[in-house]
Every structure is written in structure tokens, then in C-alpha cells.
Amino acid sequence: MSTSTQNIPWYRHLNRAQWRAFSAAWLGYLLDGFDFVLIALVLTEVQSEFGLTTVQAASLISAAFISRWFGGLLLGAMGDRYGRRLAMVSSIILFSVGTLACGFAPGYTTMFIARLVIGMGMAGEYGSSATYVIESWPKHLRNKASGFLISGFSVGAVVAAQVYSLVVPVWGWRALFFIGILPIIFALWLRKNIPEAEDWKEKHAGKAPVRTMVDILYRGEHRIINILMTFAAAAALWFCFAGNLQNAAIVAGLGLLCAVIFISFMVQSSGKRWPTGVMLMLVVLFAFLYSWPIQALLPTYLKTELAYDPHTVANVLFFSGFGAAVGCCVGGFLGDWLGTRKAYVCSLLASQILIIPVFAIGGTNVWVLGLLLFFQQMLGQGIAGILPKLIGGYFDTDQRAAGLGFTYNVGALGGALAPILGALIAQRLDLGTALASLSFSLTFVVILLIGLDMPSRVQRWLRPEALRTHDAIDDKPFSGAVPLGSGKGAFVKTKN
């Protein structure tokens, strides 16, 4: 940027079309958050009506994560081939239909399947909306674009909590899911009123369609075996999270099978840059493992261990969700100021100071608990607002939507494991201690993975010929791409 440009307030660097693109994507993400968290709010009611165990009830939250990897791959490829806008609209319709189906579910199995549909739509919305906004905004503002966008999910969760306190006590839990069909109206408006992302238009102007991840996996020479592996992964995940398997060795074996399949898909689709993709999946996996036990089971903790009524639960969740939303925006400013990775690490370190007090204070003072949750979620959960920017920077425009969608949503299986892991630990400890212990310990893993830039570092160790030394979104250097003690010019930026 020139000196004269730097003196202009950041928001004036954006034109009306860019603000309209952001507003549309943000509203879509708000609706996504609204639909997705409904199950967490009514989990105890659903558990009581269907006669479920705590682990079975938690698996309904996990179900949406089980299908996310395929939704991210499929709808991400749609975004790479046909444009970010179409993928975003299709995703909204998909998760809205799944939410409506939850309202009509007669039992556990039907609701589990509906949650699978929601997961596919959510995955597509995440990848398509994130790439759409990031590619529509100027490079020096793309951490803000990412953070501001992801705040919509937390705002949607806050809105859902308030609607829950008004609707469920009067009309029951099913009525809450019927409201979730409304985003379809918004999707139809989006289809006609928003422009395509600038980066995507420039990349594809007058050119032949790109070869997407779907083309590579399901139309290439290994398509038969890849289709079989897709069904195998789906079946393995089903048995792990819905099959009520009691044998830990079998569950571990099925999990290992899924890991091998996902790594195989990453190797095929990313070529020599597969080490980067695999490490990004690990980053996201641990990011979900530290954050989603609280996200998924906080309402249950408030209702069961603290004995809060629905109105008080909604008030506490307001502080939590609003803190995460504010944190996404703060993370955007920090990311553009400090750099994406440094901002992430600093925010997570600060959040660690608050996680133990949140669950040690008990339920006697609602306002103090609410304030602690606000700041803990602002620092710990809110910084995830710049995660799409962090991941997207490792992929070129041609593969960004599918790369971000698949990588993020395979890693998001940590969100499927997290509530079940929290529920299992809570069988030996109280739920609050289980949630605090998981979050506190696993946050340090994420700090190390991001702080040391392990995706670039492992790429340099295993396949240095395909190393990317600079972020593809904002052109800033990757610290892990340069060995310690080397000069800044040790590597040349690659165009993979």
C-alpha cells in the first residue's frame, strides 16, 4: 500500500459491491450457525423424549461432523468449477432442509441422518463463504474479511439461544427446527443479487474449466477404488459414532482406516504438496478438539450441573456466543496487524488464563460466569475466525474452495469426537472438570502446530521441491518454509 492509502480508514478501502458481498455471506453464515447449534440447545429435551444415553445424545452433535468432509469436498469442488456463489446458495438450501427434517424426526436414527445432511451443507457454506469473501476483499484486509465473516456463526448461535428461550417452553423443541427452514428464502435472494468473487472471475475468465478435486478422485484412473474408499469411510464413521461400539480396539481400527483414506485423497488431489494438506488437517482436528467440547456441551453443563432454567441458560450462552463473535472481529484486526499465525498464538495463550476459572466458579454468580465466558470465548474461540484465511493461504485459487473445504472439514471430525470424548470423561469426573481439562491441554497442541508453522515445516522436510514460501492470499512469508539460521532469500516463492 502507498503512504496515502495507509492514511485512509480501512473500511474506505472497500467499495459497495465488496460490502454487499460480505453482508450476504455473513448473513448466510449467521443462518448456518443458527441452524447448526439448535441441537445443542435442545439436547436434553431430545434425549428425554427418545430415551437416549448421554453418549447417544452427544452423537447427534457428532453426526453433522461425520458428513462434513464429503460436503466440503463436493461443494468445494462445485465452487472451484462453477463459482463460489452457486456453492454458497446450494449449501444454504442443504442445511435448511436437514434442519426441517430434524423437526419431523420420529426417533434417533432419523434425526442422525438429518444431522448428516446438515453437516454437508454446513461444510459447503464454510468453504464457499470463506473463499467468496476473502477473494472479494483487498489482500491487506483479508484477515478482517475472514474474522468478520466467521463472527456470523457465533451471532447465529446467540440468536438461536434467545429464540430457544422463547419458543421451546411454549411450543416444544420441534418448533425450533421448523424455524430453521427460513434460510431457503435468503438463498433464493442470494442467487440473484450478489456478484461472483473477483479472484475467481479473474482466474477463470475465458479459460477452460479447472480440474477439481471431484474430477481427480471420482473421474480419474483410480475412481473405482476411490468410490469404494468413500463408502468405507462413511461406514466406518457411522459405526464409530452411531453404531454404539463398545470395543475400543475396533473403534481405533476404524478411525485409523478413515485416516488412511483421507490421507490418500489428499495425496491424490494435492500431488507433491500433500504434506501441507495433511498437517492442515491435523491443525483443524486439534482446533476442534480443544474448542468443541465447550461449544457442544456447555448448554448441558449449565442445565444439569448448575441447574439453570432455560432463561438463565440463554443469558449465559449470550455472553459466550457474543464473546466468540467479538473475538472473530478482534482476531481479524490482530491478524492484519501482527500476522495470521502470530495473532493466533497470542490469543490462544491469553485464553488459557481463563479456562480454569470458568468451570471453577460454579453457578452462584451468573454475571461473573457470563463475563468469564465472554472473554474466554473471545480469545479462545473467536480467534478461529481467521482460520479460513490461515488455511486458504496454502492453496491456489483453482483448488482453494475444495482444498479449504476438504482439509477443514476432515479436521472438523475433531468436533465429532469432542462432545463424545467430553461425555465419556464426564462419566469419571464431573462435566465441568472434563470440559476444562480437554480445552486446556489440547489448546497447547494447536499453539505449537500454528506457532511453529508445521504445515510449511513438514512440507520442507518431506517434499521441498513443492514448497510454497509465501501465503497465496496476502503474499506474506511462511516462517516454517525457511530453516533456522537461513537468510530471508533462502527459498524462491513457488507457484504450485
From Swiss-Prot:
Catalyzes the proton-dependent transport of sialic acid. The lineage of its organism: Bacteria, Pseudomonadati, Pseudomonadota, Gammaproteobacteria, Enterobacterales. It catalyses: N-acetylneuraminate(in) + H(+)(in) = N-acetylneuraminate(out) + H(+)(out). It is a multi-pass membrane protein. The chain crosses the membrane at residues 22-42, 58-78, 86-106, 116-136, 148-168, 170-190, 224-244, 247-267, 278-298, 313-333, 353-373, 374-394, 406-426, 431-451. Belongs to the major facilitator superfamily. Sialate:H(+) symporter (SHS) (TC 2.A.1.12) family. The gene is nanT. One of its GO terms (molecular function) is sialic acid:proton symporter activity. PANTHER family: CARBOXYLIC ACID TRANSPORTER PROTEIN HOMOLOG, SIALIC ACID TRANSPORTER NANT. Keywords: Cell inner membrane, Cell membrane, Membrane, Sugar transport, Transmembrane, Transmembrane helix, Transport. This is Sialic acid transporter NanT. It is found in: Cell inner membrane. Its main location: membrane. Pfam families: MFS_1. GO terms for cellular component: plasma membrane.
